[in-house]
Swiss-Prot record:
An annotated Gene Ontology molecular function: zinc ion binding
Domains: entry comment: The N-terminal and the C-terminal half of the protein have a very similar 3D-structure, suggesting they arose from duplication. Requires a bound zinc ion for normal folding and solubility.
Protein family membership: Belongs to the UPF0587 family.
Assembly behavior: Monomer.
Chain positions found as Phosphoserine: S75
Residues annotated for Zn(2+) binding in this entry: C33, C36, C67, C70
Name of the protein: CXXC motif containing zinc binding protein
Pfam family, one: CXXC_Zn-b_euk
SUPFAM superfamilies hit by this protein: MAL13P1.257-like
UniProt gene name: Czib
UniProtKB keywords: Metal-binding, Phosphoprotein, Zinc
Record organism: Rattus norvegicus (Rat)
């Protein structure tokens, strides 16, 4: 199946360097089995800090699971070197923020939640634990006395 990139698009107001924080950041995804096409009903998360051994000593992955429909063992790995921030210059454009190595599992939906951080464009003020589940986030930058926000968060998956 190969590599699949998650691209983010958002409108940033007075913030930049929007990024997931830490190896325990949870990427909430819905997955599709590459063998039978079954799509998971529930959100599943994968984290950089998780590593599961593959059968037959073929390495490890962030998630290994058996398809409920066809019983095939599939896996997906977060490629840590591909995690990028979304910056002010990326405003309202799709940008790859992470890539996944997919072996039988294909991500078909993404739900951003808590665990993001960003910085004030002018002030450098750090805003941590940003939750994007509602696709919008607002706050106030005391240093510049301006409102800050992230709006209209959307995503897409593209094959690399």
């Amino acid at each position: 199946m190969g590599k699949i990139a998650l691209q983010l698009k958002a409108t940033l107001e007075n913030v930049t360097n929007l990024r997931p924080v830490g190896e325990d950041f949870r990427w909430y995804l819905k997955m599709k089995c590459g063998n039978c096409g079954e799509i998971s009903e529930k959100w599943q998360y994968i984290r950089l800090m998780d590593s599961v051994a593959l059968k037959g000593g073929r390495g490890s992955a962030s998630m290994v699971q058996k398809c409920k429909l066809c019983a095939r063992e599939n896996s997906i790995e977060i490629l840590s070197s591909t995690i990028k921030s979304y910056n002010a210059e990326d405003n309202e454009k799709f940008k790859t923020i992470v890539e996944f190595e997919c072996r039988g599992l294909e991500p078909v939906d993404f739900q951003p939640q808590a665990g993001f951080a960003a910085e004030g464009v002018e002030s450098g003020t750090v805003f941590s634990d940003i939750n994007l589940q509602e696709k919008d986030w607002t706050d106030y930058d005391e240093k510049t006395q301006e409102s800050v926000g992230i709006f209209e968060v959307t995503h897409q998956f593209v094959k690399c």
